[in-house]
Amino acid sequence: MTHPKIVDKPWGREVWYAHNDQYAGKILEVDAGHLLSLQMHEVKHETLYLHSGRMRFTRGDDVFEWNPGESIEIPPHTVHRMEAIEKSVILEVSTPQLDDVVRLEDRYGRTTE
């Protein structure tokens, strides 16, 4: 058994529970009112599942409310952003490129990693 890696973020935290050369799994805990980066990925392909809370989600030109029990697929080169309407918990599974983040806009002053 291994212990997950906890990564503190300005909007909450990530719990990395799986990361190998084939896939990655994370839990994102986003505090109410916080906004993640407007971003895209060059290679990373991810699927997100909203476990609890409510989010406003931007994917390309579409903005919609995201509710518990719904999943969203984010292929590479898809511009996207999440905003927590309520404290939210998201399950993310993806290809293993966790450092593949191209930030286009960030409320917290972070740049591309």
Pin down the residues of each PLM region.
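A short glycine-rich, His/Asp/Glu-containing loop-to-beta-strand
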Residues: 2-39, 44
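Short, surface-exposed secondary-structure edge patches
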Residues: 27, 47, 61-64
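Glycine- and acidic-residue-biased ligand/ion/polar-headgroup-sensing regions
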Residues: 43-56
